[in-house]
Amino acid sequence: MNISLRCHGHMSRRYISIIPTSAVGSLAIGSKASETEFTTKLDQVNELNSPQFKAVGQPPSVLAVHGTPSVPLYIKKGSIMSIYGVQGALLDNISSRLSLFAPIRSFFMGNHNSAYQRVVSTSPFSLLISSTSKKLFGRSAQKTFAVMNLEGTQDWAIINNNAIHAYFGTSLIRRLHLIPRKISKRFAKASGLPLPTNTGLFKWYRPGYTLLSGRGTVALVGGGNIYNVHLEDGEQAVVSKNNLLGLTVNGPHDIQNSVFQYRSNLKSNDLTIAGEKKKINPFESFSHFMSYLQMITVSGFNFLKDSISRSVRYIEGTGDFVVVTGPRDLLLQSGVPQSNLLNRAAPDQFTQSSITPKETTADFLNYVTIDKGKTKIESTPDFRKRQ
């Protein structure tokens, strides 16, 4: 995701070198930075009108932050790698304290990591921020950065509350809201959808989202790469709700006017394999009995699997995919488990079978008896039995 930043004023810079160990390997490193290969050079900016965020690396798993005097920066706790570029004594010029963002409300909204470090300095400074942060048990998985510049013209709904990794802005407004379970009547009427229709984003264990508005800069983290998708007016996109990181909205109630649950028209009956129906007698032979036993086992397993699937979908919300209606922008992350867009339905080879006694055929001999003008036709397997 390409983000352009414009900074006014004069700036002086020098370079430091960050050497990824995975890229260097057995390479001999020289005594000068200019002699070192496979390095990322970061600018140290001494004069800026406002702080600057820049995602670096490939993939961009590190955030380079250039701070300005007296402007507080909020960084996810446990993710600061380095503080550098401070003029004078570090402890005298820079201070940091713990900042909790609505801890009680965040916990019930599904944001279980709302602890940030508030960093402020009396002189310009620079930070290196890792995309991973400390958790209660170990550390989070590797993620990548995307930087958003909010100009106050549109709001962003961040579906994954834990994606907000760093931010600044005196006029930046960050609020928590409940994800609506149902779409609005107006949106249902305009889209030709029945009522009630689910939005598909609601989860019982994570029922909230973060609304970002105002002016400021926010650094988001997501699994894998982060992509920006733009939808024109009237366009729709089917998106996995696990991949949906955020979307632009017009206020806190716009989700129920733009997102609804995706339902495939493909039915499981359409995916069954057509074949000749088997008529078996389960007790005619041992093989048929084993087939009958297998049928009961598979049917019980399918019933248990469907029950678990229905329970999980009820707890999570609804299906795996949602339909998003434009005009708006979407942020999609690629590093999450994928789901199949089409409903999976395995062919049921036993439900197509009819458990009826096996029909047998045999050869018979027919004879005709004419008695007093009446004709009578009878069959016998052996003419000798007629005597």
Swiss-Prot record:
Pfam families according to UniProt: AIM24
Main location: mitochondrion
Keyword Mitochondrion: yes
UniProt-listed PANTHER family: ALTERED INHERITANCE OF MITOCHONDRIA PROTEIN 24, MITOCHONDRIAL (PTHR36959:SF2)
Keyword Transit peptide: yes
Name of the coding gene: AIM24
Chain segments annotated as transmembrane: none
Family: Belongs to the AIM24 family.
Taxonomic source organism: Meyerozyma guilliermondii (strain ATCC 6260 / CBS 566 / DSM 6381 / JCM 1539 / NBRC 10279 / NRRL Y-324)
InterPro entries listed in its UniProt record: AIM24, AIM24_sf
Subcellular location per the Swiss-Prot or TrEMBL entry: Mitochondrion
The protein, known as: Altered inheritance of mitochondria protein 24, mitochondrial
Keywords: Mitochondrion, Transit peptide
BP term (GO), one: inner mitochondrial membrane organization
Transit peptide limits: 1-23
GO CC field: mitochondrial inner membrane
